[in-house]
Amino acid sequence: LVGATGAVLARPGGTRRGFVHALAAITIGAAAMAGPLTLMWRGKQVPPIHDISTDTDNPPPFFAVLPLRAGAANPATHGGPDIAAQQKKAYPQVAPLLLAASPKEAAERARAVAYDMGWTVIAADRDEGRIEATATTPFFGFKDDVVIRVAPAPQGSRVDVRSVSRIGKSDLGTNARRIESFLEKLGGGS
């Protein structure tokens, strides 16, 4: 606002220095506001939830990461039917992945994809088909916990993934995007 006022008041017949400074102020101000405005816009596009699962009827529970979540603002337990309904409406594409691979093979591939995505793997049990990891967001460094469950299915394996933010009422869609990206990478090798 100050930059715009300066640009208007800059003397048309005088030096261009005042006008250039005013334009620089406008540009810097706009750039500074772009990030917060984008976050506000994104927050209005998604429901205020922070727990996303491919299986909303029986979300994979956390065990190994629970000590790391001590003091976290958000619980590790699923929010129940209301959260599941909001998720299904906003992210109908978040669903289990069926792989034509044995559960042990699928679990090993899932662990490799988790590492490739830069997650910190806390626990991985190929025989049990369970992986727990922590993903850290790039810019703010928020910690989100992920659990992967691999179970036998008629044609191979079923992979379910759950991602839960430790803080924040809304994840701004981060957990759904994380799950989709993970499943896309995992399914690419089937």
Predicted features along the sequence, with ranges:
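Ser/Thr-rich, low-complexity intrinsically disordered terminal regions
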Residues: G3-H21, G35-S190
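Serine/threonine-enriched low-complexity regions in disordered or flexible coil/loop segments
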Residues: H21-G29
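Contiguous mid-protein beta-loop-alpha structural module that forms a pocket-lining wall or clamp
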Residues: A32
